[in-house]
UniProtKB/Swiss-Prot annotation:
Cofactor(s) for this UniProt protein: Zn(2+)
Residues the record lists as binding ATP: L7, S8, G9, G10, M11, D12, S13, T14, T15, L16, L17
Pathway(s) the chain acts in: Purine metabolism; 7-cyano-7-deazaguanine biosynthesis
The protein, known as: 7-cyano-7-deazaguanine synthase
């Protein structure tokens, strides 16, 4: 059975890619260039797909940055530092992003005759990103199932999982986390201060494993 995975190049979606492949699906991956400052994540997504021999497509919707300003896409907005629970992190919300990405991904999945579409929303995203909440996932499941004759099924298997639990699952699957990128700033090295870096570092610490990527700051693992 064919399945499409929405792949950002970060920890969660990369783990999901390995996970779906391990279940015996014929996997296709899709990523989006939506004007994000951290577009280098797509370089890592491409490398992972090459490693796993998974067909990979990048869809350029850079125009979206003009329609939906955010600290992730607008050049003169600074990426906030801290934790996802901080109110300043709302600046990183790209309005309606996941609904747009999932809709395009669904069209791609339907064109392939895929029965399932996977994306990596997880419990740590819930406080700040409305389009990663369980209620949103359920609503999109219904909408996408009804949107075409094929009855496409949307799956978000990590929606109730913490990031450290996703990491544990990834380590079981042999995920190469050196080929993942999380930092919102998109520099040469991960900043170690933005919300996604902070969450990633905490996950590795909780699991008791050193993150294989480089950071701009010194981290006591």
């Amino acid at each position: 059975m064919r399945a499409v995975v929405v792949l950002s190049g970060g920890m969660d979606s990369t783990t999901l890619l390995y996970d779906v492949k391990s279940q015996g699906y014929e996997v296709f991956a899709i990523s989006f260039l939506y004007g994000q400052k951290h577009s280098k994540e797509l370089e890592f997504a491409k490398k992972t797909c090459s490693l796993l021999s998974i067909p990979y497509k990048i869809v350029d919707i850079s125009f979206f940055a003009e329609l939906a300003p955010s600290a992730l896409t607008t050049p003169d907005w600074n990426v906030p530092e801290g934790y996802y629970t901080d109110s300043t992190m709302k600046q990183t919300v790209v309005p309606n992003r996941n609904m747009v990405l999932l809709s395009i991904s669904a069209a791609y999945a339907i064109s392939l005759g895929a029965k399932k579409l996977f994306y990596g929303a997880h419990a740590g995203d819930h406080p700040i990103y409305p389009d990663c909440r369980k209620e949103f996932v359920e609503a999109m499941k219904n909408a996408l199932y009804l949107a075409d004759y094929i009855g496409l099924e949307l799956e978000a298997p990590y929606v109730d999982m913490k990031k450290e639990d996703i990491l544990r699952r990834g380590l079981e699957l042999g995920v190469n986390y050196s080929l993942t990128w999380s930092c919102y700033k998109g520099g040469q090295k991960a900043c170690g201060r933005c919300g996604t870096c902070t969450e990633r570092i905490e996950a590795f610490k909780k699991v008791g494993v050193k993150d294989p990527i480089e950071y701009e700051i010194e981290i006591d693992w």
